[in-house]
Each structure stands twice: as C-alpha cells, then as structure tokens.
C-alpha cells in the first residue's frame, strides 16, 4: 500500500506550505489525480487521516479531482479523452499515441487557517 507513503509525502509538503505562510492549521487540501497515476483513491482517502494525525493537517478535508485521460494521436493529430483500458485513437484507431493528461498526481490548492 504505497498510498500511505504518498500521504506522508503530501502531508510533509502541505505542512511546509502552512508553516511558510504562518498558518495555525490546514482547512483543506485539493489534489488532481489521473486514472493512470497508479494511486487507488479509496486507499488514499483511508490513509489520509492516519498520515495527518498529530500535524497541522490533522482534521482537514481532502478533496480529489479526477484528471481525465487524454491522448494525442501521432498518426492523425487528434487529441481526445480515452478509457484507461483502450489506449488507441478514437478517430483513426492508431496505437501511436502520447498521453497528454491522466498520469498526474498534483497538489492543486491548500486552504489555511491563519487566525
């Protein structure tokens, strides 16, 4: 379960942000996660309260936005959304594709309590 270590790294990063802004506590954390990131969302959500215990992040809300899987076809140039189990161009059927989005795990925003 690498989701716990992902949470620990996330909490460390968020705490550094909170401290650098003089925050007393973190209210919410927003992530953007792609379907090809390798992260199991239920496990990440389950690990979050345990990883944040005893930190400025404890008790904060974790919001997760799913990033659509988008590919660019190198044969015809079409950029489109596809399913993770069907990595081919929707227009020409080519397998010569490049993933444009859907692999990311990005910290989008942190809401802080400063007073």
From Swiss-Prot:
Keyword Transmembrane: no
GO biological process terms on file: protein maturation; protein modification process
A Gene Ontology molecular function term of the record: zinc ion binding
Entry annotated with the keyword Thylakoid: no
Biological role stated in the UniProt entry: Involved in the maturation of [NiFe] hydrogenases. Required for nickel insertion into the metal center of the hydrogenase.
Source species of the chain: Nitrosospira multiformis (strain ATCC 25196 / NCIMB 11849 / C 71)
Superkingdom as given in the UniProt entry: Bacteria
Binding site for Zn(2+): 73, 76, 89, 92
Binding of Ni(2+), residues: 2
Entry keywords, A to Z: Metal-binding, Nickel, Zinc
Protein name per UniProt: Hydrogenase maturation factor HypA
Family of this protein: Belongs to the HypA/HybF family.
Gene3D superfamilies: 3.30.2320.80
């Amino acid at each position: 379960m690498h989701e716990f270590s992902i949470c620990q790294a996330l909490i460390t990063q968020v705490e550094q942000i909170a401290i650098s802004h003089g925050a007393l506590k973190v209210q919410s954390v927003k992530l953007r996660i792609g379907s090809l990131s390798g992260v199991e969302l239920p496990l990440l959500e389950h690990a979050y309260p345990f990883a944040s215990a005893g930190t400025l992040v404890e008790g904060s809300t974790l919001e997760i936005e799913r990033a659509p899987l988008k590919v660019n076809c190198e044969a015809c140039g079409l950029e489109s959304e596809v399913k993770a189990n069907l990595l081919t161009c929707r227009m020409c059927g080519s397998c010569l594709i490049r993933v444009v989005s859907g692999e990311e795990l990005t910290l989008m925003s942190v809401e802080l309590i400063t007073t």
